[in-house]
Amino acid sequence: MILTTTEGQKNLPRYFSQVFKMLQRMESGRLDIALPDGRVFRNEGAKPGPVARVDIHDPDVFARLIREGELGFSDAYLEGGWSTPDLRAFMDLVHLGTETVYDDFTGKFLVQAYERLRFWLHRNNRKQAKKNISYHYDLGNDFYSLWLDETMTYSSALFETGQESLEKAQTAKYASLVDEMGAKPGDHILEIGCGWGGFAEYAAKERDLRVTGLTISQEQLKYATQRIEKAGLSDKVTFKLQDYRDERGQYDGIASIEMFEAVGQKYWPVYFQTVRDRLKPGARATLQIITVADRRWDVYKNGVDFIQKYIFPGGMLPAPTVLRQEIQQAGLDVVKSKEFGPSYDLTLRRWYDTFNDKWDQVAAMGFDERFRRMWNYYLTACGAAFDTGNCDVTQITVAKPN
């Protein structure tokens, strides 16, 4: 029997009635909540949408949602307090519309203040930036190579049809960056945040560019250097284990692929001033950046979400309007931008499928079920944010005035 109201129901988990009442504001989709005693409660919006089910294993989940907001609920998932047969469907439902279900559950002030303090302590000065990057990217090259495509690219691909391979779509993204930047054969370009060297290899091999790539991840530097040596491109590509703020000289162009998100809001002016200083007069930089919708900016900037706590400590996304303001304040001109959020949704879904297909091999490296739940939560939450338009990804091209 499916229940649609808590009226007359006894022995409900603490705060469940309050949570269920708030969920009745859902406009689209359907959510079933199965309690430990077998009772199933259903909320259904008037409009069609994702259909999801949540199985509650720890009755304290609802108290944590009220007390701690989104982070409390996500923490409970990592700890096995609740589960769902289709995490992607649940995330699609949660992020549907102009707001998220979590907006009604902001958490208590002291909990919010504590998480903001933790986030502040992870701000990206030079020392902390290296720690923050290592936290994520130094999980191991073998780990990432299991579920990324052959290019070892950990950023959004650019799909044309959605049917092509991830490798082909990643190469299309690289091509777009060079095209938008306007780099010509023989030019010397700077890549701020070179990852595992995929873009640098493409730029040198396919577009005859010289590339200087910067990273503060020891693991990435090792992999990228070996990759370029194997490709016979060491005369064209140089990698440095160096903070972007310490680079000197000027370049014919700059590429930066989803590195800005790790900079931290305090250092956005420094980042764009560095871009300006490193460009030759009249030269362009094309920056691939994840953005949070303008309508979500106030809620987002004043909180700490799951991604900031567990995946990218110290990270912060800009809103499109804020991003353009920062660029202009640095004395750079916005030339154009290309948005392709649906491609990121598809990229994340491909990663999710491959990660889970390869889970036995990932587990053999020492990663446990809690890590699996964390990674799946991260991939599906991000995918849903792009699918619903709460987040987008842009290749924004800026120029240094002559």
Question: Where would I find each of the regions flagged by the language model?
Answer:
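Feature captures hydrophobic
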Residues: 1-164, 168-170, 176, 183
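A short acidic, Gly/Pro-enriched loop at the edge of an enzyme's catalytic core
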Residues: 245-254
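Conserved SAM-binding loop of SAM-dependent methyltransferases across substrates and taxa
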Residues: 196-207
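Substrate-binding/catalytic lobe of Class I Rossmann-like enzymes that use SAM or dcSAM, i.e.
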Residues: 290-402
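Conserved SAM-binding loop
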Residues: 224-225
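Conserved class I S-adenosyl-L-methionine
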Residues: 185-193
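A short glycine-rich, Lys/Arg-flanked "PGG" loop and its adjoining helix->strand segment in the class I
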Residues: 269-281
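Conserved beta-strand signature within the Rossmann-like core of class I S-adenosyl-L-methionine
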Residues: 282-290
